[in-house]
Amino acid sequence: MGIFDDVNNWEKTEGAKIISSIIDVADPVILDYGCGAGNYSFAAAYAFDQKCKVYAVDINRQCLDYISEKAKSEKIGCIDAVEGREDYRQDFDSDTFDLVIYADMFHGEEKIYGGFHRFIMIEEAKRTLKKGGTLAVLPFHLSNFRDKDRKKSKYTYKKLIDEITEYGFAYIDNELQGIHFEKVYSPYYQQKGGITFESLERGKLLIFEK
């Protein structure tokens, strides 16, 4: 069994279990922002047996085409692949979502905000989440963050939690871990070889309630 089979199996089993443990809502509306290949979108679809609506948002058209084709082949009709905006704002109404997922999105120095994009994303999560809704943040590359002085800074989970709670979110401690799927789809790592599902990076999933 290859790594893509392992990933598909994770989406249907462990990934689905993680999503269903985060929220207990009938027919939830979910945003997977910066979705990449849609691993967490598919996990959400399986978590609720497609009795949900999932918006998989990314600025990469190739990712969205991949998600649409995969959803079609797996007969999943609850996922909408939506092209995102480069300014990290969301074209959704306020109080729309039961769950917002930000996986591997907060690090780096993007061209518009110089590394401050995560603050825009937190603001947008607060706006678009329903009251009592859940924000799930899966941060990686913690040594490649920008602090509020725009200086490169090594972050900790606690420092990031403190930042997010300043926006009025309540942190919910848990033992959940997510997976960093970047290497699965990276041409560089595919060419390099040697990537196994077991070798993929795991990280703490930070859960907040609006």
Language-model features and meaning:
Residues 132-139:
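Conserved beta-strand signature within the Rossmann-like core of class I S-adenosyl-L-methionine
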Residues 9-28, 43:
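Conserved alpha-helix/loop element of class I SAM-dependent methyltransferases that forms part
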Residues 116-131:
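A short glycine-rich, Lys/Arg-flanked "PGG" loop and its adjoining helix->strand segment in the class I
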Residues 31, 42-89:
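Class I SAM-dependent methyltransferase SAM/SAH-binding core
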Residues 98-117:
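A short SAM/SAH-binding and catalytic strip from SAM-dependent methyltransferases
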Residues 90-100:
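A short acidic, Gly/Pro-enriched loop at the edge of an enzyme's catalytic core
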Residues 169-210:
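Class I S-adenosyl-L-methionine
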